[in-house]
Curated annotation (Swiss-Prot):
Binds 1 Zn(2+) ion per subunit. In plastids the minimal PEP RNA polymerase catalytic core is composed of four subunits: alpha, beta, beta', and beta''. When a (nuclear-encoded) sigma factor is associated with the core the holoenzyme is formed, which can initiate transcription. HAMAP family: RNApol_bact_RpoC2 (MF_01324). Zn(2+) binds at C224, C295, C302, C305. This is DNA-directed RNA polymerase subunit beta''. Gene3D superfamilies: 1.10.132.30, 1.10.150.390, 1.10.1790.20, RNA polymerase Rpb1, domain 3. It catalyses: RNA(n) + a ribonucleoside 5'-triphosphate = RNA(n+1) + diphosphate. GO terms for cellular component: chloroplast; DNA-directed RNA polymerase complex; mitochondrion. DNA-dependent RNA polymerase catalyzes the transcription of DNA into RNA using the four ribonucleoside triphosphates as substrates. It comes from the Eukaryota. It comes from Coffea arabica. Transmembrane segments: none annotated.
Amino acid sequence: MEVLMAERANLVFHNKSIDGTAMKRLISRLIDHFGMAYTSHILDQVKTLGFKQATATSISLGIDDLLTIPSKGWLVQDAEQQSLILEKHHHYGNVHAVEKLRQSIEIWYATSEYLRQEMNPNFRMTDPFNPVHIMSFSGARGNVSQVHQLVGMRGLMSDPQGQMIDLPIQSNLREGLSLTEYIISCYGARKGVVDTAVRTSDAGYLTRRLVEVVQHIVVRRTDCGTVRGISVSPPNGMMPEKFFIQTLVGRVLADDIYMGPRCIATRNQDIGIELVNRFITFRAQPISIRTPFTCRSTSWICRLCYGRSPTHGDLVELGEAVGIIAGQSIGEPGTQLTLRTFHTGGVFAGGIAEHVRAPSNGKIKFNEDLVHPTRTRHGHPAFLCFIDLYVTIKSENILHNVNIPPKSFLLVQNDQYVEAEQVIAEIRAGTSTLSFKEKVRKHIYSDSDGEIHWSTDVYHAPQFTYGNVHLLPKTSHLWILLGGPCRSSLVSLSLHKDQDQMNTHSLSVKRRYTYKLSVTNDRVRYKFFSSDFYGKKKNRIPDYLDLNRIICTGYCNRIYPAILHENSDLLSKRRRNRFIMPLQSIQERENESPGISIEIPINGIFRRNSILSYFDDPRYRRKSSGITKYGTIEMHSLVKKEDLIEYRGVKEFRPKYQMKVDRFFFIPEEVHILPGSSSIMVQNNSIIGIDTQITLNIRSRVGGLVRVERKKKGIELKIFSGDIHFPGETDKISRHSGVLIPLPPGTGKINSKESKKLKNWIYVQRITPSKKGYFALVRPVITYEKRDGLNLATLFPPDLLQERDNVRLQVVNYILYGNGKPIRGISDTSIQLVRTCLVLNWDQDKKSSSSEEAPASFVEIRTNGLIRHFLRIDLVKSPISYIVKRNDPSGSGLLSDNGSDCTNINPFSSIYSYSKARIQQFLNPNQGTIHTLLNKNREFQSLIILLSSNCSRMGPFAGVKYHNVIKESIKNKKDPRISIRNSLGPLGSAPPIANFFSFSHLLTHNQILVTNYLQLDNIKETFQVIKYYSMDENGKIYNPDPCNNIILNPLNLNWYFRHHNYCEETSTIISLGQFICENVCIAKNRPHLKPGQVIFVQVDSVVIRSAKPYLATPGATVHGHYGETLYEGDILVTFIYEKSRSGDITQGLPKVEQILEVRSIDSISMNLQKRIEGWNKCITRILGTPWGFLISAELTIVQSQISLVNKIQKVYRSQGVQIHNKHIEIIVRQITSKVLISEDGMSNVFSPGELIGLLRAERMGRALEEAICYRAVLLGITRASLNTQSFISEASFQETARVLAKAALRGRIDWLKGLKENVVLGGMIPVGTGFKGLVKPSKQHNKALLETKKKNLFEGEMRDILFHHRNFFDSFLLKKFHDPSEQSFIGFNDS
């Protein structure tokens, strides 16, 4: 007793709480010291103690013990706030759906994780003896995840397909779930009834297959004499010491281990914990160990390769059935594994990205040359740094240096003020190089009816040349322009042309009708019958064909001269495919820069002799009416008819004879056409002054002689400016028409600069007011010389046009009006006298005789601060057909500022005289504008009706005078939308001008230069185009030059996502056709704009057609053609994005099964190719050797074995299940032990395609001394079970009839070596540790020893051959295959 007391006094007293792991350690040490029986005795005492204490404590668990974390409220609120901002950005078109989904998942995942981390400290501080806390954190029952669901928040769930549901469950189970949350959480339940039942059966089946594959593996020999081993590196940062110890303990060394000259361990010595600790302290070089992979026995295993038995710490006994033990050890824990985990979705690669936060308030500075602007995967603007970046933060007197690692995102700008703890950078999680990613498709559906537009070039997917699948080359917006489509064939209307205004009551937008529009060129008033829904027929005459109204058909946005109908045959053709470069304001009409309007065929293909463009020289433009006369007497009349052949939308120009007109004259006069009933306040033949009142609402603009003629249509009143002479002699003036008389230079009244150069002319006209006498009216004449200035050099700047050899542009001038024909202009319109045609022509080459057509595309370049658009015409079709507007039936549009005026004034605004009735009539909200779309076959057209409700109007702007009527209508009605149409301009002429500028990339940097290559007929020069604007935090736009088209979007270009209602004065540059994102401030104290396209710009207001932007990133697929009508719910874009396949997608049991059955993963990661190329360079050198096949197959097999073991271990470890590597290795050895004979070398032994054990193939090769070609294959466990040496075991597993029939046909012999065969036949099982005693060693045994020695000699020779490869091999494997995330033994040695 005293002895015992003395012993107790020497014992150390440990005052520590003991948890599960400490308990395990204690038990293992007790077994090592005292053996099994004594240990169990001690453990019984511990158990009794535990029960006593637990009863005394009487821990009970009630619902009150679940304490919710106090910080949960604001964490959830914060996440909801972020989600709201995200939703807004998505609405504004700054992020697309995939980015939104990613970010919202990350926001909620992070919130859930923070709550989970808060849990343990919260319990510790508030209630350390909380039963829940004691129970879960001691490891007795329950784990962190379950407690997190009880007191934290349940977080994100996945649906049955493993996709994330982006609606998080915010409640925990203590607070209770709402109905929606309950339904969602039923998806992800892993302890549900369904889940458990399925899991048990799955795990059972897995165990059955595993045992099947390894049932015959028994320990039969002591040593197989192998010389190979697998090398394990000593623990470094990548591989925790715990796993290193687990890997080594219980193994047998394959090679001696030296520390310097001293041998610290010998070959075939088994490794205990002491030896491992010695290795760790000595940092021994890679240690070569024997594993089941290296064993050379074909159908069993030797003691030394297996090592110690896990049950009793000694070398395994002979006759132990290690295969079955291995199968059960892996299969049994399968019931503990989950089928799915909680955090599935794999959207984030490994948790949350790490953030770098600012240490203090201050200004941030970094070197901008080292960073590169980009978009993060959430669509935020950021800088990507490629190398280590040092960021300094300067507060009042302290400098903080922050180092940002490479490949990180910098989220702030240079010189920006940051606050303490603000996130300034995001470090990308270091993903392993071979992480598999899967491609996911996400469809975005349209929210509303309308037309689709995009703002960049779009490539056709090459396989569908005529399909409607387009790929986006760069980040851009897609816009859905709102408008209600009508389709049906109930009513046949022949009347409505494009751009006509109409009453929406005449056709119901709710019902979808289609009108087959017969195209007629007759310009009389149509009568048409609209069937009302009551069945009555009414005669209706539409009110839009007044004489003085220009019918603007097609998509022409320029005013064409309003001539009378007789000579309007040239101009009245429907110009469907015209696009116009400049659009000037009325005030600057006199000195504007020349505008070229270009005509493009519908399909975008020019034929030979097509008229490429018209050019109206402003020098030949007049504002007043008048008469044209041609110059000198020796001239003939002008070309009588220009041959304008029109077919399939292409205009060709074939002049039969073409005249040079030297000069012609324009005699101005003022003409008013009045209704017959109007009262005229001036007399015929009287002379009036300027601004005399003629009728109630018309005043004269020029002074002179008045002539009044009554005609059928009404009264025609002309005012001739000029002087009256009473001539003495009659003969000088002819009776019929006027005469042009030249004046000597310098004389006369017209004393301008031009008079020195030109002769002045006057026009003398004889007027006979009565029978008594007559007088002569001398009228001033404006002389026009046809100058040579109109060549290509003036049309295009000389440096921008270089013609190819075979594409020519010819300039053709012609005068629009016949000799002496009167020209009438109504009100303010200007009249064009001379038109210049550019005719496109090219030589017919013998080689390229096939090219009868030349496709056209647009190029945008920028010179001297102006954006210009050029048409590029190629004779060769490009492989990627640019369909800028190729498939656009509704015409091409392009519009640009030539810099003369920034705000384009709508040209229609002053055509009509205002009257109250008319304005009120057009403010009728039920009126819409028709917008015709031809369908593909052009058989009938469908209409889109733009209602007033689809447009919103900004304005009126301050400081602009406008007519009283409009002011009144604005005063009377509060709604600013009412006064949309104060003029009858074409609302909805959007498509022709939609594409006139491309969006800048959504980057926010103003120093970036993008080089666009201009290709107008092969030009060599390149231009740098600055397309970036940046906006500071106040919403001001800084842009490099003011004439540019700015994308006004405060959120895109803004670094701080600032408060949405905050706006300062912005620079207003609005151009026709521009797309505007929501929330843009146009002027100070104005309401925000709705998103849409500017279709109508006036002096004082803008009309915007509502549109919805969708952001699309490169590589997205756009469905539908440009300008096509989409209905609500149509697929608009398809995004293809990668999400990393972290271990999350298939987890637990399915994952293990996937590996063991060697099922392939759907898609291969992007960076796999590069790595394989790298391997090939190294491998080719090895494959040159005579042992090439052997080595390459070995290499493949060893690598695959190692990685399979690691993958399976990873799944089990992640669930906290510990399995010894040996068990997994035995199974993996069976999967990888077969090779497939290939067809390369026909050998005499095996037929191609036969599956043979690797060792057997090697032995055959040595015996026959000829190379056998084979390649390594991975068999799944099912296939491996069906490819054994015993047909009885195969037949008892699967496909019994097939296996037995084949065996009978082949005459297979079953040697009954395994367990299963003997069980089936009822024989004695050839296993068991006493088995060796029954079999007496015979003479053959001695022979076997001799053979072994010979073999060892052979191995020695082989080692010499392979010796020079060995170093190379080791370094190669260590470099290439070392996967940082997975520890393991790397490489293999031929030692």
